[in-house]
């Protein structure tokens, strides 16, 4: 649940330029038009705020105001500070809008509408803006932001197209909803739903004017609800007058319609959900434009599910003919898509190409109207005639891409977290006039269905098909009984931070609702392989902690219509919602929520609730107080006097006051004008007086909390001892520094003493080099002095090189052998020379140089070995002595 940090900031309040976005127009005279004809303004949804990034579009009467919130905030915060602000400067600032002075980040957009704007609906690509009145629809071609940032005093006039100039007119039924189709090419497919249950699909293109004049598909839901065959006519009648009475005019009166988001799974992106005023809910699937572009995983996932459904229907002998017909129709529909060659079209931004498919013509262009849905586990005390629906909000199921991406776990992990951490069921939220929110689950799942063809032989006296059903998971109220008004029109608004959170806006206030406490636990239970105890755990989940709801704003004054809350999450602006009354903005800034990574499989065991003690709030945000409009409204007395001077009673102003019927009539008219204004001013002054009294109590609370903080600070700094003489802050700081230094020196001395003591009492572990050197010395001692000298030492390694002593013995043996051989050879040579003195050739033909070189080499080796042995002996003697 978000925590409120602050309410409307200074850069949105008067006299800041941001307040001009919501101020009423000076020449707005539309309020008197219904009164002139004796009519009453028909209630309806008020969605007068649309956003595009940090830009917002606000409808005020017949005007649209554009503003860049980031630029308005920056310009207001960077303004030069004023030394004094008085009534003169405030009045001058408030008159800037009337004078039409250009302001950075603010612009007026002129519209061709003839009535007050009720709704603003932004297209998915944020290049079209649908402008709705009670009966008409206009499409505004939004320019680039750079064109709107140009400072100009004149109103901006973008290109406007009238949608259905002969269809959506005042002589026909009112328009209740206009939603952009999530699968439209470049987001340019608009679906309009009128009050008389007529659905029209418009595929808009600025290059073809005809696309704004006629829809590509028009369906009369009253005809479709009574139809029995696929080839019947479901078109809309061209007559503008009612032919006669029909009970469907009451049962099929549409209150609202919506699509799930584009990234939903299954059939959800092409399912239009409709809420009727009578309390019924219908679904139309699949509803597609003539040219549509699916997400990358939509067609493969639908193809896999359809093939599995057809196989299951054929293999199951208990499947009904209706189930087999639906499976075959879905297979025929998907086969036509598979046989198509998609057309590659560049996106509106030009960054990538998209695949465009054509709507299948088989089994038919118009799907079956599914409904009305039955509500399982509906509250027993609820009466059907007491429920009057006003809005519907559908959260689509998460995409099931795990089966399609087997073996591609890396790519699966790289997909968005929201696609994995969601519910595999559609969630349908219904909102009634009384503020009751009903949360339902689509357990069976809405799939594509068509009416049977006429060629199919139906069974005589076949039982009617069971109506689809929705499981009522939770029902709760967002309004008190005293806050319910018959003309109130509550509305849903999505949240920018979570798909499972939304807002409910009503003239009484704004309520935040979050489904996260149970959504992920329910999904974990649905995906669990273990069936033991499932019923118990689901029952515990249903009866346990439900959805979070919190009234974050309450309108204290007389209830006036509030614009549907618009959620904005921007790094420059923060996380907040924006709404508005007829004259002032309503902004609530929240702490940026942490986005925890929810594991794929979470335990359904309810953890123990550990109450964390929050810090004591020494500053609580309070809503901004706006004085009543009666204090700023100009008096009607001067206008009445001017009218009296020019009317037939003007002689009475100059004559002496006399008791007559004419004088009584003048006094009576003047009393009506003055009493109305005085009554409004009295109420406004009384409210202002009560607010001032409340401010005194709030100020006392603030002073009390400040004193508590002061006492805590004095306790920490030591100023709470009243017996001691007063000490200056400088002395306290110096004393604390001196105590800290003494403490540091004491700790350092203690550490040094402990280090010395530890060094004396403990033996330091030998290093690896020291261990290797000791092992080498022990091996040398064993080799030279014998095995007895190495007893009690560490064990030597088995794989050592040849020991020096053995090498010395071998060298000595070789030397003796060579010396003996040399002497023998020399002796043999001498004997040969003596016996044969005349012989010129010796018996051994070895040159003397070679013999001398070999002998020298042998002698050098002997000297090196002797030196090595002497050095080892000396080293061992030193070690033994040490």
From Swiss-Prot:
Q: Name one GO molecular function term.
A: structural constituent of nuclear pore
| Disulfide bridge partners, by residue number | none
The signal peptide, as residue positions, is none
The record's region (Disordered) falls at 76-98
Q: Which GO terms describe its biological process?
A: mRNA export from nucleus; protein import into nucleus; ribosomal large subunit export from nucleus; ribosomal small subunit export from nucleus
One GO cellular component, as annotated? nuclear membrane
Which topology term describes how it sits in the membrane?
A: Peripheral membrane protein
Note whether NADP occurs among the keywords: no
Residue ranges that the Swiss-Prot or TrEMBL entry lists as coiled coil:
676-762, 806-829
Matches recorded under SUPFAM superfamilies: WD40 repeat-like
Q: Where in the cell?
A: Nucleus, Nuclear pore complex; Nucleus membrane
Alphabetically sorted, this entry's keywords are:
Coiled coil, Membrane, mRNA transport, Nuclear pore complex, Nucleus, Protein transport, Translocation, Transport
Main subcellular location: nucleus
Assembly: Component of the nuclear pore complex (NPC). NPC constitutes the exclusive means of nucleocytoplasmic transport. NPCs allow the passive diffusion of ions and small molecules and the active, nuclear transport receptor-mediated bidirectional transport of macromolecules such as proteins, RNAs, ribonucleoparticles (RNPs), and ribosomal subunits across the nuclear envelope. Due to its 8-fold rotational symmetry, all subunits are present with 8 copies or multiples thereof.
Described purpose of this protein according to its UniProt entry: Functions as a component of the nuclear pore complex (NPC). NPC components, collectively referred to as nucleoporins (NUPs), can play the role of both NPC structural components and of docking or interaction partners for transiently associated nuclear transport factors.
The identity of this protein, by name, is Nucleoporin NUP82
